[in-house]
Amino acid sequence: MGSLKTYYTGLISWDWSLYPLAPYKGKGWIINFEKSPVILRSGLVNYGNKTKKQKEVIINACNYSSAQNALEMINSAYMLISAEPSFAEVEFVIPKDKEELIKLFPYELSRPHRCTMGTSHFPLACMIAAKASFKRSHKYALAKFRFASKLHSIFRVDIDPSHATDHLGISPFIENHIRFAYSIVAAYSAIEEIGLEIRASVNSPSMIDGKWNPKVKNDIEERLRRVGIDSNETFPWDLRGKPTRIEKSKQLPSRGRCDWARGPYVRDCELEMIDAIRIASFLRSKISSHKMNPLVTSLTSYDVENVRMLARRLLLGALGFWPPPWYERNKKR
């Protein structure tokens, strides 16, 4: 890599000691966790009977652009594992070298403190970013997932069946229709980046007389198998409230209700993985992209979350990080 410069990220890790020890090596950069001059108060965190110092994510890279790209990938990876909108992000790396700092960010010298963000699981985000950095399709898939999430995403509590409400239904606002649609487009594009989209055509459609075209089915099952995803795995598909016009237009090949589905409002069902990808493809190609389909007014946050969380599941699987370490292996999301 040649000589490397040091860049501060402002990302403060509370749980660095619970993950494999750094360094984490990406393509053209290296991540370490070091004591930071910006950590205020005691900087101590208790885990069980152990007390550990918080540490900052430090990027060593050959230049600013490389370090900044690494930070962007860490932010994308963190959004991938959290599955939620970000309260805030640290947007820029800060050079340790004073001359480079003055050249890039002269105002930083007059600030009493750098921007920081402290939370858990930054080491996991760094590990994901490092692995993804070696493959262009993985880098762009991460970026597209983050872009989709910024366009529209919701907190898990808002989709938790025990907190089910009707406030995430159909929106009367055109801006929301566009936001929902293009979040779906971006999320499905992340699936395309990792090569797990449905590959069908006019001459070789995905379905023939209501059944899978064996050629198309075998193809997607093989591509899933190559990245370590079982095509027989089911994926929970959120269905809330009365069926929308979109739901009525495309019958879902349900494998049965989810364990938590109760009553007429929470109708979540299990789909085979390949069927979930096919329905996501339908939402992308027939509803959300190109000229707006009249059915776009029936898109809801649940449609967006279904495609976004499917992209998350497939991307984490393709990168070798499914399930996240704090989930039970039988959890889907």
Stretches with model-predicted labels:
Residues 129-333:
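Amphipathic, oligomerization/interface secondary-structure segments
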